Swiss-Prot record:
Organism taxonomic ancestry: Bacteria, Pseudomonadati, Pseudomonadota, Gammaproteobacteria, Enterobacterales
Keyword Lyase tagged: yes
Active site as annotated: H71
Catalytic activity: a (3R)-hydroxyacyl-[ACP] = a (2E)-enoyl-[ACP] + H2O; (3R)-hydroxydecanoyl-[ACP] = (2E)-decenoyl-[ACP] + H2O; (2E)-decenoyl-[ACP] = (3Z)-decenoyl-[ACP]
Alphabetical GO biological process terms: unsaturated fatty acid biosynthetic process
Pathway the protein contributes to: Lipid metabolism; fatty acid biosynthesis
Protein name as it appears in the record: 3-hydroxydecanoyl-[acyl-carrier-protein] dehydratase
Gene behind the chain: fabA
GO MF annotations in UniProt: (3R)-hydroxyacyl-[acyl-carrier-protein] dehydratase activity; trans-2-decenoyl-acyl-carrier-protein isomerase activity
EC code: 4.2.1.59, 5.3.3.14
Organism superkingdom: Bacteria
Protein's job: Necessary for the introduction of cis unsaturation into fatty acids. Catalyzes the dehydration of (3R)-3-hydroxydecanoyl-ACP to E-(2)-decenoyl-ACP and then its isomerization to Z-(3)-decenoyl-ACP. Can catalyze the dehydratase reaction for beta-hydroxyacyl-ACPs with saturated chain lengths up to 16:0, being most active on intermediate chain length.
Amino acid sequence: MVDKRESYTKEDLEASGRGELFGAGGPPLPAGNMLMMDRIVKMIEDGGSHNKGYVEAELDINPDLWFFGCHFIGDPVMPGCLGLDAMWQLVGFYLGWLGGEGKGRALGVGEVKFTGQVLPDAKKVTYRINFKRVIMRKLIMGVADGEVLVDGKVIYTATDLKVGLFKDTNAF
């Protein structure tokens, strides 16, 4: 049985990366530097703009984060693809939270828009995921719209983020 809390700490998310949070069959989050959030502050099954689920997570920003030292030298900015990946990570995490089993794989995105950036002097990135569709049959898949905010301002939007869970990824 999945522990369906409304919030998760960094330690919980790291446990997910080791396969300890959702059990042996549940989808793990990435580990180490590729885990793009420090906490999940809200996770509900019947909320969000489409009433199919909502997730909100946060990443604390400081100038010592690994990507600022290499992207770009003399012009540090968080790569936009990391914000996009964070949204996919949260879609997969939600599927595991619902009891889905398998390894998460991003399946696509409808449209992504960047209207701002994350710089080293920012304090916090917030991710908001609003689920549009969840399939929990032989096919396990989530479809959601997402936003990335920096210090309260929306800077990225994505429509139709798609993640599937696969028990066998060799045929993927």
